[in-house]
Amino acid sequence: MSGARLHTLLPELTSRQPVMVVGAAVIDVIADAYALPWRGCDIELKQQSVNVGGCALNIAVALKRLGIEAGNALPLGQGVWAEIIRNRMAKEGLISLIDNAEGDNGWCLALVEPNGERTFMSFSGVENQWNRQWLARLTVAPGSLLYFSGYQLASPCGELLVEWLEKLQDVTPFIDFGPRIGDIPDALLARIMACRPLVSLNRQEAEIAAERFALSAEITTLGKQWQEKFAAPLIVRLDKEGAWYFSNDASGCIPAFPTQVVDTIGAGDSHAGGVLAGLASGLPLADAVLLGNAVASWVVGHRGGDCAPTREELLLAHKNV
């Protein structure tokens, strides 16, 4: 059923609503680890690859490959890492609205365990050094979908980004807090939620959000209470169990697409990219989440987080589903 619906939706993807992606482009050094290091240990890693990544860049790539045009505000610096990122973006047909910042881009070490679980250690760069001059360069059209990552919102520039968001008219923020949901100060988090964003959380992040907002940790009750408290849409991703969505109009659980997990790097980013592509095409939230599930299932079945599929690859992957 999901595969048949996906085959109906993919030809409908087209840019009907403007999208702007605000966030980071960084380098991911990915290595296999037989176990996570413990204090005082010295373990041997097997390097998989050095990939261009970052939540916002993964989403920009996913949107581009699905045929959705977006404005990409991904600060690029002047160092070695920045040049690698710039070249990779050029190959994807992407440009950044914020280029030639002073300093280099950040990077992270991703350790992948035998079961595919990943652990990140991050080093910040220009992607977390937002300022008013950069923001003044951005023209956000009315009715835009506006993506933010929790990594930037939890950084020292988070308050500046929220202040900018609060001044925008008629936009729909899409926020993937990621693991930083527990690091954003209460006052700033309240201001973010007052903007009525569409929030996407994974299982662990939903538990943290429930505790922070004094809501139920049971998914369906959480979704109902979320609507009552914030009057804003919510997506809760449950890996192989699919994804729940909640809005003022409807709620439900969209099944996951079957896949063989290789690693889960970029799973949440790619899901967000699929959802944004659906929403930008005018699809209802349920169909957008279905598209997000399909894109995420492809990405976790391949190495690295920057391997989002094209429409044709999705069609072939799920032709018998």
PLM regions with names:
Residues 73, 121, 254-255:
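Hydrophobic residues at beta-strand termini and immediately following loops
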Residues 103-106:
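Short acidic/glycine-enriched loop/turn segments that link adjacent beta-strands
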Residues 63, 202, 268:
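Short, conserved phosphate/pyrophosphate- and ester-handling motifs at nucleotide-, phospho-/glycolipid
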Residues 1-25, 86-100, 112-251:
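Ribokinase/PfkB-type carbohydrate-kinase core domain
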Residues 1-75, 80-84, 261-262:
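Glycine-rich phosphate/adenosyl-contacting loop at the front of the ribokinase-like
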